[in-house]
Amino acid sequence: HGISRMYVRYFDVVADAGGRAVPNATLNFATAMPQDVDIVPTVFVMPECLRGDRKQLASLIVKRVLQMNETNDVNDVKEIQIDCDWTLSTRRPYNDFMQAMLDECHSRQLQLSSTIRLHQLAQTPPPADRGVLMMYNTGDATDIRCHKPILDLHDAAPYLPYLKDYKLSLSAAYPVFTW
């Protein structure tokens, strides 16, 4: 299929009962990763996890990703991606966290990318080497009246003018599945 790069969700970071950020739903490497494909470990961070020490969180995430790579023979990783559904109210702590992630990644010769949702295009971009615009989930998949919940260009169109002046290099992620 000509796939040269795979974004692989390694784990989520969620708040435990005490409000501490902890890893959850860690990937179980049942088979080896393909050796001829660039693997980009991706970590989903819940916004409420950004209330604590963001530098420590960044350090722990990078260390966990690197340990998972080593344990599972995932070699030559050049980039880590952070996925977070941040909003205007969580933008500042997210950007602080992303700056800590950027510093941590660069100290280890890694690049950092961030997912960018359509609604986030209207905000200042987070600190990152690049972004990946998520061109999917534009509708409500639980609403039977929504005919194109995965990608409806009509729903995406209001956000597209923000691309012209967006200050972060972006590539686009499109859905590659049907139902």
Show the residue positions of the predicted features.
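N-terminal mature-domain "stem" immediately C-terminal to a signal peptide or N-terminal signal-anchor/transmembrane
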Residues: 1-10, 16
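Residue-level marker of positions within ordered structural domains that often coincide
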Residues: 3, 11, 87, 136, ...
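Context-gated lysine
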Residues: 5, 55, 63, 78, ...
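Chitinase-like catalytic core of GlcNAc-active glycosidases
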Residues: 12-133
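Substrate-binding surface in catalytic domains of secreted glycosidases
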Residues: 92, 99-179
